[in-house]
Amino acid sequence: MAKISKKLFAAYEGIDKQKAYPLFDAIKLAQEKSITKFDGSINIAIKLNLDTTKVEQQLRGSISLPNGNGKNVRVLVLSEDITKEEAASVGADYFGGADYIQNIEKMLNQIDVIITNQKMMPLLAKLGKVLGPRGLMPNPKIGTVTNDVLKAVEEFKRGRIEYRTDTYGNIHMSIGRVSFETTKIEENANALLNLIKSKKPATVKGQYIQNIAVSPTMGPGIKVVINNN
């Protein structure tokens, strides 16, 4: 642990903690300052001026990042309208019908997304307390409850990911890997920021985006210049 702390301390060298960097420069620094031996993620944290006790100020949805984020998303499809072979052909990792639902609690650590249609939702309702806190409960707002299950699987396997505000109005997301070209990560970040700006609730007063920072999986957080236009 001491060795890691020493590396992390060293990673802060050359970074002005009080300075906000242009987005490209901040991402480049985050890549250079990663201290993991593996190809870690580049993450973004966005602080929004939202009162999440108000339903209309709770942001949740999904976005297809233009360059993906490099993560292998493990998808479970629950449907009785398509075959296992059809689901597998578009990249689904697991597949089942109504009788498969009983297996879900045993495989929570093996799946990242559950995609289904409206007909299956009443059967999944009994697992709400298990799936909800883990962010696994299918939801039409993020495209995981849909009539076109196969298309949804393709999108999530290509890099479509969920975004949502936490209790304090923060959004945390992976927007790429350390090994990505910096411009590719910048494009992903801008796509997310533009989407969030377009979702600004009409009831928000004052500065909407209050803080932005990017960071590697292990390494320093770097402030980003905010453009609220």
Swiss-Prot record:
GO biological process: regulation of translation; translation
Keywords assigned: Repressor, Ribonucleoprotein, Ribosomal protein, RNA-binding, rRNA-binding, Translation regulation, tRNA-binding
Protein name: Large ribosomal subunit protein uL1
CDD domains (UniProt xref): Ribosomal_L1 (cd00403)
NCBIfam families: rplA_bact (TIGR01169)
Function: Binds directly to 23S rRNA. The L1 stalk is quite mobile in the ribosome, and is involved in E site tRNA release. Protein L1 is also a translational repressor protein, it controls the translation of the L11 operon by binding to its mRNA.
Pfam families reported in the protein's UniProt record: Ribosomal_L1
Gene Ontology terms for molecular function: rRNA binding; structural constituent of ribosome; tRNA binding
InterPro entries documented for this protein: Ribosom_uL1_bac-type, Ribosomal_uL1, Ribosomal_uL1-like, Ribosomal_uL1/biogenesis, Ribosomal_uL1_3-a/b-sand, Ribosomal_uL1_CS
Quaternary structure and partners: Part of the 50S ribosomal subunit.
PANTHER family, sorted: 54S RIBOSOMAL PROTEIN L1, MITOCHONDRIAL, LARGE RIBOSOMAL SUBUNIT PROTEIN UL1M
PROSITE patterns reported in the protein's UniProt record: RIBOSOMAL_L1
Record family assignment: Belongs to the universal ribosomal protein uL1 family.
Origin superkingdom: Bacteria
